[in-house]
Amino acid sequence: MANPKNTASLEELKARFEQAQSTLLTEYRGLSVAETTELRRALGSDVTYSVAKNTMIKLAAREAGIELDESLLTGPTAIAFVNGEAVDAAKAMKDFGKDHKNFVIKGGYMDGATIDAAQVEAIAELDNRETTLAKLAGAMQGSLAKAAGLFNAPASQVARLAAALQEKKEQ
């Protein structure tokens, strides 16, 4: 008969896998409790970071319909369940790793696929959703301003512009 404590832990991990938008796995060997707490703060409230046995992680992931690469489940493993921006979590982990040489990003699971440490590092280099949307809005605003200027121009300027474009095409 299964240990009730292990069964409860397994169910909790399974629920976290099912609810998380992505997961990131790390090796925490050599980190103090204070350093782990510092990492949790850096990850923010959208990320649950916890230590678990590799066999429990493997079983919970499988029960949640996720197949993790076996190479991610070696050594002491901590897992970050990301319910917000994976980019922000990856950046926080990468920055934390710069100051704490014992901290190792193993990889994770995102968008239905296992990712390795190099892919997590690449994700950390991306802009987050808010920044990307702001850049897109800025680009669109510039284009819209040009279009508005064109629509507000007198008809003679529009005709000259059309003629210039026609000449350019003919050349």
Curated annotation (Swiss-Prot):
GO terms for molecular function: large ribosomal subunit rRNA binding. The keyword Ligase does not apply. GO terms for cellular component: ribonucleoprotein complex; ribosome. Gene3D superfamilies: 3.30.70.1730, 6.10.250.290. CDD domains: Ribosomal_L10 (cd05797). The keyword RNA-binding applies. Keywords: Ribonucleoprotein, Ribosomal protein, RNA-binding, rRNA-binding. One of its GO terms (biological process) is translation. It comes from the Bacteria. Belongs to the universal ribosomal protein uL10 family. Forms part of the ribosomal stalk, playing a central role in the interaction of the ribosome with GTP-bound translation factors. Part of the ribosomal stalk of the 50S ribosomal subunit. The N-terminus interacts with L11 and the large rRNA to form the base of the stalk. The C-terminus forms an elongated spine to which L12 dimers bind in a sequential fashion forming a multimeric L10(L12)X complex. This is Large ribosomal subunit protein uL10. The gene is rplJ.
